[in-house]
Structure formats: structure tokens, C-alpha cells
């Protein structure tokens, strides 16, 4: 419910291309018999999470450990157990170099890497690198159990976070470009070449709720610094003022690899704009990419459906 309220401006807008966004202060919910606007509703439900005992774990990485089912922070997860379920978790498998995966007792596809804007937001290669960067990414020279991981050409494996790969040519450059996912602890006893670990997949956790509460407070004209800096303080990062810009950045730093970025960027009104290497499409200024196109097959089956504005 907290997520629904936080995104109410987007969900209640039936014309996202007219340049007139909805106002969360004028969207109302009834909660426990009380009429609250969207931001107050989000805050109310975030408070309810604290009331039932959810809290930040002292160790950020514990939420992604092999036995993270005992986390007091994780609210909604997809349970994984290699001995009980056939479900697989491909994020780590797809990200690492295949020799890196092999050194960990499994395999990998050498694919997914962080984009450069994410790496720069973490302060990589500066004196102000975020404390979560090394917890979330493999970067630089790779070692496993204190031993270097070697590439097929005899060179030591090293990931280059500021290198960009667009075409998967199979070259050494492509195999080492980009920071790779390291957020989840590696289950060295996993099945299916590392695709069936015991780590539960985290979908929603209390740190997210705190950042949601901070954002809702700011949008409602209140101070959200307490919640923002509770999240930052857990990893030893200094105080930061709770502005919408800072909250959006904090959500990137804290929740990277957790699947919220597109929703966040749409809510903050920046998804369709130019940033870093992302160039705005010529006809995108009206924000039509806020929503996806309706598949043509669905329109063919139901003539009453009309394609979303901006798509042909």
C-alpha cells in the first residue's frame, strides 16, 4: 500500500503527455477511518512496518547472504532453496566473467554490467566513493580465495567499471568492460552451475520503506532527513540533506540491482530525459515513454483497446 500511495501521482494520471501532473496532496485514501493524502498514506503504512518489527540490519550485506531468510529487514522475498525448489537466480550468473564463476565453483555468462552513470554516482575512482560500492560490485583485479582469476589469454582478470560495452563481440575488451554484480553472497554449494543458490531474492526491504517515507515527507512539505540518514548511517556515510534529488540518488546507491530504478525515475519525472550517455529521443519530450506500448496482439484481440499515446 505504501508503494501504491507513493506512486499515486503516476497511477492516477490518465494523460501523461499533457504536461499537467497529478498532485499527491489532492489524491486521497481512507486509512483506518482517516482521510489522508497520498504522501500521508505512504508515511502511515511505512510506520506500520516499523510497528510490526521490521528494522535495518546492522550489516547491509546480511540481507543478501546465503541464509538471508532470517533478516529482520527483508519484508518480501522470493524464497530459494536448492534442495526444495527448481527456481533459479540468474543475476549473478549472467554478470560475472565465466572464469570468475568457475573459480567460485559454478559458471557464468559474462554479460550484465553496471552502466557508467551508476558507477559515477557511486563516486568510483574518486576520494568520495560510496561505502556500498564494494558490497554491490566487482571492480578491478579479481581474486578468489586469495588467488588471481586468469583469463583464457593468460592475463589476470580485471573488470574496468568505466569502460562501456555495446556489442558483445567476444573480445577481451568486452569480457572485462563494466563493473559486475556482487550484491548477493556467493553460495559455493549452489546447484545448476550457480543458478540455484539458497539466497532468497529480495524484492522489498525496510531500507526502501525508510527512503519512501523520507520522500513522502519531503513531497508533503516536511523534513525527511531522519529517515534518509538512518539508511546512510548504517553504512557509515555522512549526513545529507533530504532533497528530492538526494533521495533519488540515495535510492540508486542503496537499492541498486533490486529492480526499482525505472519506477523511481518515472516518479521523479526524469525517465524520459537526457542523462549521461542516454540521449532523449526526438519526439520524447512529452513523456510518452512513461508507460510501455500495448502489444499489438492484445489490441487485435480487444478492439476497444487503444494504443498508448506516442506509440504507433
Go through the PLM ranges and name each one.
Residues 3-166:
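An aromatic- and glycine-enriched ligand-binding surface/loop that stacks and positions planar moieties
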Residues 131-231:
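C-terminal substrate/ligand-recognition segments
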Residues 1-9, 230-236:
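Acidic helix/loop microenvironments that form the catalytic cleft of cell-wall polysaccharide enzymes
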Residues 43-46, 225-228, 244:
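Extracytoplasmic/secreted envelope proteins and their assembly/folding machinery
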Residues 65-103, 107-112, 193-196, 201-203, ...:
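Long, intrinsically disordered, low-complexity segments
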Residues 7, 11-14, 35, 212, ...:
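Alpha-helix C-terminal capping/termination sites
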